[in-house]
Amino acid sequence: MGTNLSVPNPLGFFPDHQLDPAFKANSENPDWDLNPNKDNWPDANKVGVGAFGPGFTPPHGGLLGWSPQAQGLLTTVPAAPPPASTNRQSGRQPTPLSPPLRDTHPQAMQWNSTTFHQTLQDPGVRALYFPAGGSSSGTVSPAQNTVSAISSILSKTGDPVPNMENIASGLLGPLLVLQAGFFLLTKILTIPQSLDSWWTSLNFLGGTPVCLGQNSQSQISSHSPTCCPPICPGYRWMCLRRFIIFLCILLLCLIFLLVLLDYQGMLPVCPLIPGSSTTSTGPCKTCTTPAQGTSMFPSCCCTKPTDGNCTCIPIPSSWAFAKYLWEWASVRFSWLSLLVPFVQWFVGLSPTVWLSVIWMIWFWGPSLYNILSPFMPLLPIFFCLWVYI
């Protein structure tokens, strides 16, 4: 098959075949299959630069002849020597003067002895200079000085290296707060159901609570009144009970917040001035004296009658709103003033008060715990508000 001239091979890409332009052999153009200058098979895949441009030269020679350029062979031409220099000076020229350090490295000018000693107080940098257990009078290694100075300069000029310990501690706090908040949220969501169970248990003292909305004709199985399905007639009553419970919880939170703000002195309510009216038609009260220090709350309230002098009463720094409510209730209900001596006497008997409290806790403790246990998740929230507000 190697001498079969009937097999066309236009560009010579098949191994062991060359293109015969006349499709016959003669003395000037021998059979190309017998050409001793042809390439072997591994060389046929080589990409050359020649007659057809980069990578387009046929591997066995182009159609333009057997010249080196046609076959993609490059001839190295020696470069012409440079012309003789006309400069009379020969040899190495002197090195030019370097620009000042303050122009090339301005950050290095900030590194003076004061900054060096301040940085030396850092425990991390101090460990590079003095060995463990050594003193400041020890020998300082030059290599450590160089590294410390360069690292300190780079720390001033380059980007700071992030401290993974600070990043981890910074992320740990929000994650713990998120976990605690989610835990409290799940517990708070159980408060309405627990209070609903306690509410319905009051109707079944000593027995198992059973929904009263089901009857013999309904297809609803026996269930608790706190878990009524939507098709049960008692479902609407369960929703009403839980809505009332939510309102009570919201009211409890608002009362606690009001008490906390009043205790902190953030409710500067003007007390009732003796002899003044409690209605809106009474004398106009205006706070004229600012509070002591930098507080924005006033310290006293004044009223000025049309035919008299100005009367000012100081505002309590704490429990101002509570005292205002007590004064208002004492004006409306005169019998409350009779309880003041009794309360003062009872508070003055501290041993008796403590014994009474201990006895009440011992006697009513278990039942009070069953009643107050649903409100336990609210205690951490109240505690955080009390501490941080």
Swiss-Prot record:
An example of a Pfam family matching this protein is vMSA
Q: What is the protein name stated in its UniProt record?
A: Large envelope protein
Give the family per the record.
Belongs to the orthohepadnavirus major surface antigen family.
Q: Which GO terms describe its biological process?
A: caveolin-mediated endocytosis of virus by host cell; fusion of virus membrane with host endosome membrane; virion attachment to host cell
GO annotations of cellular component type = membrane; viral envelope; virion membrane
Spell out where the chain is glycosylated: 309
Entry's localization field = Virion membrane
- Function per UniProt: The large envelope protein exists in two topological conformations, one which is termed 'external' or Le-HBsAg and the other 'internal' or Li-HBsAg. In its external conformation the protein attaches the virus to cell receptors and thereby initiating infection. This interaction determines the species specificity and liver tropism. This attachment induces virion internalization predominantly through caveolin-mediated endocytosis. The large envelope protein also assures fusion between virion membrane and endosomal membrane.
